Amino acid sequence: MKTRTLVICLLALLAIVAAGIYRFMPQRLAQVPDISLVSVAGEELRLADYRGRPLLVTFWSTTCSSCIAEIPHLIGLYRELSPQGLEIIGIAMAHDPPNQVLGMRKSRGIPYPVTLDIHADAARAFGDIRVTPTSFLFGPDGRVVQHRVGKLDMAGLRLEILAMIASQTNSATDPGLPDT
């Protein structure tokens, strides 16, 4: 009897944990949402305008230690690969006080656009993001190439972006016409 009760309790606990994980996991996203954001510098960022280039969108928070630890790596990635077409947009969560986001952007010297998602519109458009860091890498065609909840694998991400850039470069130099 005790074993049966224990098994039932464990199954109930497992169901509760699974439901909690499901609740906080973003819904599947296939393409860049057609939304506009405004950067903290006042620049309008229409995500559809980023087609044709690799785009990394990362949801972060000033209170998220993993997010803060990623910032120097994202800055390095941006400085290395933005001349070749990479775009990065950081979206601060709705619960982040704007003055803290602005302060962190300035103190960390973040060169890529950072936006405030004050009403959580971007979080909803990306599948109801609730956990940080959550990142999406979109290919030049606007499709999701990589979706990550938690810390990014920076080496793998860099290789993925380099492959996209190389593919674009090869497409631009080789139109697929037969040699004559």
Give the predicted meaning of each segment:
Residues P33-R51:
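Short extracytoplasmic/periplasmic juxtamembrane "stem" segments immediately C-terminal to an N-terminal membrane anchor
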Residues M164-D179:
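Short, low-complexity, Pro/Ser/Thr/Gly-rich segments in the mature regions of secreted, periplasmic
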Residues V32-P33, L55, T132-P133:
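Short loop/turn microsegments at loop-to-beta-strand junctions
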Residues I68-R108, I118-R124:
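Structural microenvironment flanking redox-active thiols in thiol-disulfide oxidoreductases
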Residues L47-S65, L74:
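Short active-site neighborhood of thiol/selenol oxidoreductases, capturing the structured segment around
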Residues K106-P111, I118-L162:
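Thiol/disulfide oxidoreductase modules built on the thioredoxin-like
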Residues M1-V38, G176-T180:
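N-terminal targeting signals for export/organelle localization
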